[in-house]
Amino acid sequence: MKRGASQLAQTAVFIALLIGGQAAAASFGQLVTGSLVNFILIISVMTRGAASGIAVACVSPVVARLLGIGPLWALIPFMMAGNFALVMLWHLVTKIKSANVHIVRIAALLSAAAGKFITLYFGIVRLCVPVFLNLPESQAAAVAGIFSVTQLFTASIGGALAVFVLPVMEKVSKTAFTK
């Protein structure tokens, strides 16, 4: 029971970081906010596991919408799917056994960023906007711009930050808990 409560509390901390980060970075635009969100998603899956990462990934788009920085409600399930792809690909790739953990993390960065981009591009740009939403052409183009290559950039930046920060977190964690 203690382990489950601890896992839940630590996941809640990541959700709180996500909410605070989204609110604080909202005025800086999608590149900063999206990169920060992806960083938090990756750190949560790497430090607390897949269940924590998935929980944070699913909460993220809803919180963004409630804060007024997210897109239309109809896009939320697709954003959840994109975040899920990022978290699960990162989780699965980092399970690969290798003598060089940095190579594995870079492979995770590349595959997870590409997976999120592909999921969002086909889910939102190619399916949701043209089939389910009746948007004026200018608004449809704006949505397409937000959910195309920009997502690849923000996922890559968040992943790169995680690649650099994770070793520091691991070192601090080992030092803090071995004394």
What role is predicted for each listed range?
Residues 1-179:
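Loop-helix junctions at membrane interfaces
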